[in-house]
Structures are given as structure tokens and as C-alpha cells.
């Protein structure tokens, strides 16, 4: 249903935002960028 697809979209957004945040954090910590 609509709510299921909305929930899946939110989860997808959260995952990609989390990955980006983790990459940025790791970059700042170990200066690998």
C-alpha cells in the first residue's frame, strides 16, 4: 500500500544519508579524503 512504499522510501533515504554521514565522519577522523 501507500504507507508501505512511503516507509520504504524513508528507509532508503535514511540509509543513504547515514552512509554519506559515515563517509564524511571517517574522512574527518582519518584524513583519508
Curated annotation (Swiss-Prot):
Pfam families: Antimicrobial_2
Keyword match Cell membrane: no
Keyword Zinc: no
InterPro entries for the chain: Antimicrobial_frog_2 (IPR012521)
Location, primary (coarse class): secreted
One Gene Ontology cellular component annotation held by this UniProt entry: extracellular region
Tissue: Expressed by the skin glands.
Disulphide bridges: 27-33
Family of the protein in this entry: Belongs to the frog skin active peptide (FSAP) family. Brevinin subfamily.
Function per UniProt: Has antibacterial activity against the Gram-positive bacterium S.aureus ATCC 25923 (MIC=36 uM) and the Gram-negative bacterium E.coli ATCC 25726 (MIC=18 uM).
Name the UniProt record assigns to this protein: Brevinin-2PTe
Amino acid at each position: 500500500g501507500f504507507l508501505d512504499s512511503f516507509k520504504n522510501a524513508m528507509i532508503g533515504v535514511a540509509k543513504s544519508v547515514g552512509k554519506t554521514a559515515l563517509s564524511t565522519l571517517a574522512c574527518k577522523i582519518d584524513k583519508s579524503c
